[in-house]
A protein has these predicted regions:
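Phosphate-coordinating loops and pocket residues in cytosolic domains that bind phosphorylated ligands
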Residues: 25
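Conserved catalytic segment of ABC-fold P-loop ATPases
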Residues: 1-8, 21-22
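Short glycine-/polar-rich loops that comprise or flank the Walker A/P-loop
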Residues: 4, 29-32
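Short, charged/small-residue-rich alpha-helical element at the C-terminal edge
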Residues: 32-171, 175-176
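ABC ATPase "signature
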Residues: 17-18
Length: 178
C-alpha cells in the first residue's frame, strides 16, 4: 500500500509526521526566489568601461570597491568572477569588471526591493553571474502579493525571469535536525 505521510527522524526520535505539504507548511520558514537578470546592453557596458583601462590591477579594483560597501562584500562571495580573475591573472578585464559591476547594482536593487516587501530577513543565498537566489521569510508576504509585486516591478529591476518555491523537504530535514 502506498502512503502519503512522511516522517522525519533523527537519532532515533520521530521529529515530525505529516504529508509533504503539511511538513512544508509547519516547518518551512522561507520561500525561495530564483531569478535571472536581463543581460547588460552593449551601451551600458560601454558607458561603464569608458572610465577604465582595458585591464585593471588589484589595487585599482579594490579602490573602486571602497566606494560601495555592498560591492566590496559581493567581491568576497564564493565564485566572484572578478576576484577569481585577479587571483589567477593579477588583473581583470574591463569588460568582465563592467558586466559584474552592473549585475551587482541590479542584484542590490532587487535585494533592497525585496526587503521593502518582506523585511530585513530577506537573505541572498547566492549569486552567480545572471542567476540570483534569495530566501524570503514566509511570514512577510503572501504568495499572490509577492507575484503581483514581482510582475509589476520585474522590468524596472532588470529581471528576465523568476520562480518562487517553498523550502524543499531536504532543506526542512536539515533545519530540523541541526
Amino acid at each position: 500500500a502506498l502512503s502519503s505521510r512522511l516522517g522525519i527522524m533523527a537519532e532515533g526520535q520521530l521529529l515530525t509526521v505529516g504529508t509533504a505539504q503539511q511538513i512544508k507548511e509547519k516547518h518551512g520558514s522561507s520561500q525561495e526566489l530564483v531569478l535571472r537578470l536581463r543581460p547588460e546592453s552593449e551601451e551600458a557596458l560601454s558607458q561603464v568601461m569608458r572610465d577604465m583601462s582595458s585591464e585593471l590591477e588589484a589595487s585599482s579594483v579594490m579602490a573602486m570597491l571602497e566606494s560601495t560597501p555592498w560591492r566590496r562584500a559581493a567581491y568576497y562571495r564564493p565564485r566572484c568572477i572578478v576576484r577569481l580573475q585577479l587571483e589567477q591573472r593579477g588583473c581583470v578585464e574591463a569588460s568582465v569588471l563592467a558586466e559584474w559591476w552592473l549585475q551587482q547594482a541590479k542584484g542590490h536593487a532587487i535585494e533592497e526591493f525585496l526587503q521593502s516587501l518582506a523585511g530585513d530577513r530577506v537573505e541572498l543565498a547566492e549569486d552567480f553571474g545572471l542567476y540570483w537566489r534569495f530566501r524570503l521569510p514566509r511570514s512577510g508576504l503572501s504568495l499572490p502579493q509577492l507575484f503581483q509585486q514581482l510582475e509589476e516591478n520585474s522590468a524596472r529591476l532588470g529581471m528576465d525571469e523568476y520562480t518562487v518555491s517553498q523550502a524543499t523537504l531536504e532543506q526542512i530535514f536539515n533545519s530540523i535536525t541541526e
